[in-house]
């Protein structure tokens, strides 16, 4: 990524200047700016969808490049930044020897020169946020007629790392499939967020409308640990 990122800090706290012509301003380490990025989502987004998008990023980003401990530090710094605790965010960044050439978490470098880019949706909510649908509306989803449609298997990959095949019916809604997963694995429907081809699936969508190819894996982000009932020991 260019040796300038791995250069020693001088007494002013800035990286030594280097002019290798990389086209990236790596010469300076600026303090984290307090201004939050303003952005608009491609579609109106609920708080739950925003959390799902963030969970998906943090679950997958360390697998592609960079060091896990730096990703962990950036996640903690991003949370502190959004919570307006700028001193904590800056302390986390400094403690992990992370360089911010532009004073923003959207472009960061570790001391080995690895580059890390945080999407704006991990730093601030969009300007077109909408209210979450109420639980009452979810309860209004009608039950499909017994034995309607046809039975099929759906491959799921949970964010806990578990893969499984779930028996569903073609007339099931996503909400009813969540209930089936709850019965099989103990994951509350409200703690599940389903994704197909990177698109969040809403509770009212029907399986037959999703056109999921055979053996295609549907991602399920679990927002709490799976709770398996265990006997109480006296």
UniProtKB/Swiss-Prot annotation:
Domain Ubiquitin-like, residue spans: 152-227
GO CC annotation terms, alphabetical: cytoplasm
Keywords: Cytoplasm
Biased composition (Basic and acidic residues): 32-41
Residue ranges, compositional bias (Polar residues): 9-21
Record localization: Cytoplasm
Predominant location category: cytoplasm
Pfam families in alphabetical order: UBD, ubiquitin
Cited PROSITE patterns: UBIQUITIN_2
Name the record gives this protein: Ubiquitin domain-containing protein 2
């Amino acid at each position: 990524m260019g040796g300038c990122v791995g250069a020693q800090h001088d007494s002013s706290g800035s990286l030594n200047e280097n002019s290798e012509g990389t086209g990236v301003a790596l010469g300076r380490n600026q303090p984290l700016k307090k201004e939050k990025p303003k952005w608009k989502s491609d579609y109106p987004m609920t708080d739950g969808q925003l959390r799902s998008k963030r969970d998906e990023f943090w679950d997958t980003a360390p697998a592609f490049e960079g060091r896990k401990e730096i990703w962990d530090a950036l996640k903690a710094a991003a949370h502190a930044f959004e919570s307006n605790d700028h001193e904590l965010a800056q302390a986390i960044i400094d403690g992990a020897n992370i360089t911010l050439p532009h004073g923003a978490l959207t472009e960061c470098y570790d001391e080995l020169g690895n580059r890390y880019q945080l999407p704006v949706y991990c730093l601030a909510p969009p300007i077109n946020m909408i209210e979450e649908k109420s639980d009452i509306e979810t309860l209004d989803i009608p039950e499909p007629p017994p034995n309607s449609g046809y039975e099929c298997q759906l491959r799921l990959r949970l964010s806990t790392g578990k893969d499984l095949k779930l028996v569903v019916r073609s007339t099931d809604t996503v909400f009813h499939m969540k209930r089936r997963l709850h019965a099989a694995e103990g994951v509350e429907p409200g703690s599940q967020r389903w994704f197909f081809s990177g698109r969040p699936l809403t509770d009212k969508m029907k399986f037959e409308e999703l056109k999921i190819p055979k053996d295609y894996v549907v991602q399920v982000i679990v927002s709490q640990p799976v709770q398996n009932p265990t006997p109480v020991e006296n």
